Amino acid sequence: TYNCLYPISQAMIDEIGIDGFKAATPENIWYNGAYTCTEYIQQNTKTLTKNPLYWDTEAKLFDSVTVKMVESVDTAYQLYTTGELDHVDLSESNLTTIYNNESDPLHDQLVEKRPTKFSYQFHFNYDKHNDDQSEDTNWNTAIANEAFRKCWYYGLDLGSYYKRTNAINPYKCYNNAYTMQGLVYLSDGTEYTSLVQEKLGLPAYDGETMTRLDSEKFEEYKAQAMEELTAAGVTFPVHARYFIAGGNQTALDSANVLKQACSDSFGDDFIVLDIDSYVSSLAKEVYYLKRQSFAIAAWGADYGDPQNYLGQETDDSDNAYYMVQLG
């Protein structure tokens, strides 16, 4: 079961028992949500149909909702223009073209998305393996070095990469906390992530810069890292391997922007981003085999509390997806 099924009815527990609830199937579980999934076609569509027994009789529901699965935002955009989709995210190029042309028929349909419950982070792999499953000693030694990691923190400017998500207001994507902005507020009205900024000793978000960047500290830690790691047998540049879906041009374009950002920020003498691809399953082909140097991943809490985010980073149980899959 999942959070959409809570709170659980006591009458259901009385009827099928605790063990029966743990083993419940769609045929015997009690459910009173707005929609039921009436059709699911793998890698194609899922259809949600209005539940006539939904408890909120005043709610205005669609008769059905069809969610289409597509391989890229470019494909989705084409489906939108032909009327097959009702809304779509735009690639950087499509957004820029439409936004800068007020006569474009889609210009007045542009809406800036509200922030979701997700927060994205870089997750370093400290036990990277090569394709033959031997240990990637060069990367593992480098990423274990604190000065090397601080170079990423103080040096990596992601402004150009943020434009891939929001070309108009790219720094709205910037966040130094595990939680999304606007998730929770303190009793005095302080927004939680602004408190995190304060505790980190960083200035408040200004919407125009990445507040953690510090060129002087970056150069200091780069020199320190290269000295310490050279002594430890690491060869430079250190290659960081990053995976995207094969055949996805949008993902490749974004990865190339990230590669250039790494080059501009670190210098090709220090760190080089290598772009690789997987065929169908990022987890099975990459994460389970520990082939990635890092992953860019997001967590969205099932309830609005920072603990639910932080548990993914610090909990060593099987329920901590990040720790288990990306750790």
Over which residues does each language-model region extend?
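Gly/Pro-rich hinge or "lid" segments in bacterial periplasmic/extracellular proteins
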Residues: Y2-K60, S64
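Short, solvent-exposed loop/turn segments at the edges of secondary structure
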Residues: W30, I41-Q43, K60-F62, E112-S134, ...
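Short, well-ordered beta-strand elements
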Residues: G33-C37, K46-T47, D63-K68, F236-G247, ...
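Extracellular/periplasmic solute-recognition and catalytic clefts
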Residues: T38-T49, T66-Q133, T165
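Append "and occasionally in soluble cytosolic enzymes with long acidic Gly/Pro-rich linkers
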Residues: T49-K50, A142-D264
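Short helices/loops that flank or line small-molecule/ion binding pockets
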Residues: D74-L85, T96-S103, N256-D264, S280-S293
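Ligand-binding "clamshell"
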Residues: T97-R114, D305-M323
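Extracytoplasmic/peripheral linker and loop segments enriched in polar/acidic and small residues
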Residues: A144, R149-K150, Y154, L158, ...
